[in-house]
Structure formats: C-alpha cells, structure tokens
Regions:
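Small/polar/charged residue-enriched interaction surfaces, especially the RNA/DNA-contacting tracks
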Residues: 1-137
Length: 137
C-alpha cells in the first residue's frame, strides 16, 4: 500500500503530539505550534529555527527537534551545493539543518519552508485534538 506524503506528515504529527502529551507540555506545545507558522511567514524558516533554539523551555526544544528531524526525513540526501547534501533524519539537528539551509539554492530553501508549513498544519490540528483528550469531561 502506498502512503502519501500528507499521510506520512499526519502520522508523524500525531506521534509528536502524543510525545508532547507524555511529557506533560501539550498545552504549551499546542500554543507554540500555532504561533510558529506565523513566525515562519513573517521572519523566515531559518530565523524561526534560531528562535526555537534560543529558548530554554522544553516545548521549544521539542518542536525544534520535531521540525529538524522531519526535514531530515523528507529532504535528507538532497544536494545542497557541490559535495554537500541535506542531513538525513538520524543526524538532522539545528546546526546541520541550518548550515544546509543557508548553503542551499533558493528552490530547496522554499521547499524546506513549504514542507515545514505543511507539517505544522498537521501538528497544530493533532496537538489541539490531543489536548482535548487531557481535559476533564
């Protein structure tokens, strides 16, 4: 059975919402995932990743890891420039992803931004849905 990229995004987002709930930061993670999309649109992907890296709160670090690992999963191995490739998921961290982004051609940077926004749409929805499971009936 072939699974679409959007289905893979949905599965990944649900797993990450579950992780945030297990670490008891689902409320903060939900709010952050909603604001990060706007931040990307206003400031750009690299600036937003740097913002998440600069914060000490667990939910900021968690979302940063989720986004960089996803970019590694979907873009890993893509040529960035001569002899350099986008890092694969197991090693994709803030520093490696940032280096790949600032060395990448504009079409790859736009693709990374679009992919991040598409994932965030799922994360926002699933984090919000997962949050309601935590609320008393």
């Amino acid at each position: 059975m072939n699974v679409s990229l959007d289905q893979r995004r949905a599965q990944y987002a649900w797993e990450k919402a579950q992780e945030a709930a297990q670490h008891r930061v689902i409320d903060e993670y939900t709010n952050l995932s909603k604001s990060v999309a706007s931040l990307i649109m206003n400031s750009g992907l690299m600036q937003t990743l740097a913002f998440l890296q600069s914060k000490k709160d667990y939910q900021h670090k968690m979302l940063l890891v989720h986004l960089t690992k996803w970019l590694g999963r979907t873009l890993g191995g893509t040529p960035v420039n001569e002899g350099e490739r986008f890092p694969h998921e197991p090693v994709a961290d803030f520093q490696l992803v940032l280096a790949a982004l600032y060395n990448s051609p504009s079409d790859l940077y736009m693709r990374a931004t679009s992919e991040t926004m598409a994932l965030l749409r799922w994360i926002r929805q699933f984090a919000d849905a997962r949050k309601t499971l935590e609320e008393p009936s």
